[in-house]
Amino acid sequence: MDPKLLDILACPICKGPLKLTDDKSELICKADALAFPVRDGIPVMLESEARTLNVDERLDK
């Protein structure tokens, strides 16, 4: 995924910042505790496609 794209993307729910996971498979919104998938380098920014972060992921800094 292009780093410039990450600079302009925001969470579709709270409009907060997103963080790309180390394996580049998800975009994380800590505020909403959601992980949006990245498929073939394309972020899927639909709430219905996001998964809820588990407790350990929520506490991970």
UniProtKB/Swiss-Prot annotation:
Gene Ontology annotations for the cellular component aspect, listed alphabetically: cytosol
Signal peptide range in chain numbering: none
Recorded superkingdom: Bacteria
Annotated Gene3D superfamilies: 2.20.25.10
Pfam families xref list: Trm112p (PF03966)
Family listed: Belongs to the UPF0434 family.
Protein name: UPF0434 protein Avin_14770
Organism field: Azotobacter vinelandii (strain DJ / ATCC BAA-1303)
